[in-house]
Amino acid sequence: NARKWMWDNDRQFDELLEIVTNATIGFLVLQARAGADALMLFDSWASAVPAHFRQRVVIEPVQKIIAALRGEGIKQPVIGFPKGIGEGLLAYCDQTPVDGVGLDHSVDIDWAAANLPRHITLQGNLDPLSLIAGGPSMHRAIDAILGALADRPHIFNLGHGITPETPE
């Protein structure tokens, strides 16, 4: 269990986090130089990180990654996706220099519109399962997202990945 290992092996965990952070920096530099219009940091397991570790394990690596990108002259916008941290998005947006933040489908879109900083572009957050349901319920969900975010920068997207059952 990775979380137990994090608790039991402080120094080794920090070393691993440093390796992953540096690899991410290298990868994103290559993506940017290859012509990517925007860069996205997927932290799909952010919700598994206990709140008191979030600064060290989620926020500080993002700070380091974006600082390194800017130090390399990379100007593309960076979107962070700390899946499942709910109201922790406030600290994430305030403490990291992300240009945008991905919202998973569990985030209340009205809360996000009212509480997250307006200078940060929001991305998401249609429930991927709504694509399977389709029809009027899917259209209502789409309309709710578009309505809540009509007056701020927004990238319409799913709140997480497409499932294998999704029709083509």
Question: What does each model-found stretch correspond to?
Answer:
Residues N1-E168:
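Active-site loop segments of alpha/beta catalytic cores
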